[in-house]
Amino acid sequence: MKFSPLVQELIDSLKCLPGVGAKSAQRMAFQLLERNRRGGSKLANTLAKAMTDIGHCQQCRNFTEEALCEICQSPKRQLSTTLCIVETPGDVIAIEQTGEFFGKYFVLMGHLSPIDGIGPDDLGLDILAKQFATGQFSEVILATNPTVEGEATAHFIAELAQQHQVNISRIAHGVPVGGELEYVDGNTLSHALSGRKSYQI
């Protein structure tokens, strides 16, 4: 069965969302058209405004409507000499929710991937190098994902930081809290063993 051109365009547009296939997009489109036109209009308006108004923080590259994001504008954060480097804005939220980190961030918006044509400049590493050169950071925490690409990106940034005499640390990877060893995969267990630390009593 063929849908009207506009209905088909709506379905195709919804398929751009991650994890949304043809069937899911069709259900969403029908839900908006049949039962929630007001919600659909609000979604369309908010989406249009977000696409126009949301950009990147000039300092950390996180999403913001201002020149600097809320974290970079914080007087307490401005005094910090610790920089945490993450791949996505979602990683910033995850770390902030722990309540354990009070430094600054740098959001790469991805990771190095030569196959996909993503190089250092695409991740803003030229901006990062300039920040290292100012001497404002005493430590950089590499919080990229424990994937092949994430590790390659961390290694590249570590070499960059080393050129500017910045101390480098990497977030620990290992056994999840509440997990049982027999169910942990070999790579994770290997990371946990190599990253072990002394036990404090």
Curated annotation (Swiss-Prot):
Query: Where does each C4-type zinc finger lie?
Result: 57-72
Task: Determine if Transport is one of this entry's keywords.
Answer: no
Instruction: Supply the Pfam families for this chain.
Output: RecR_C, RecR_HhH, RecR_ZnF, Toprim_4
UniProt GO molecular function: DNA binding; zinc ion binding
Per UniProt, the keywords (alphabetical) are:
DNA damage, DNA recombination, DNA repair, Metal-binding, Zinc, Zinc-finger
Taken from the UniProt record, the cysteine pairs bridged by disulfide bonds within this chain are none
Keyword DNA repair set for record: yes
Per its UniProt record, what SUPFAM superfamilies does this chain match? Answer: Recombination protein RecR
Q: Which GO terms are recorded in the biological process aspect for this UniProt protein?
A: DNA recombination; DNA repair
Superkingdom of source = Bacteria
> What job does this protein perform?
May play a role in DNA repair. It seems to be involved in an RecBC-independent recombinational process of DNA repair. It may act with RecF and RecO.
Q: Which family does it belong to?
A: Belongs to the RecR family.
Name of the protein this chain belongs to = Recombination protein RecR
Per the UniProt entry, what species is this protein from, by scientific name? Colwellia psychrerythraea (strain 34H / ATCC BAA-681)
Gene name, per UniProt, is recR
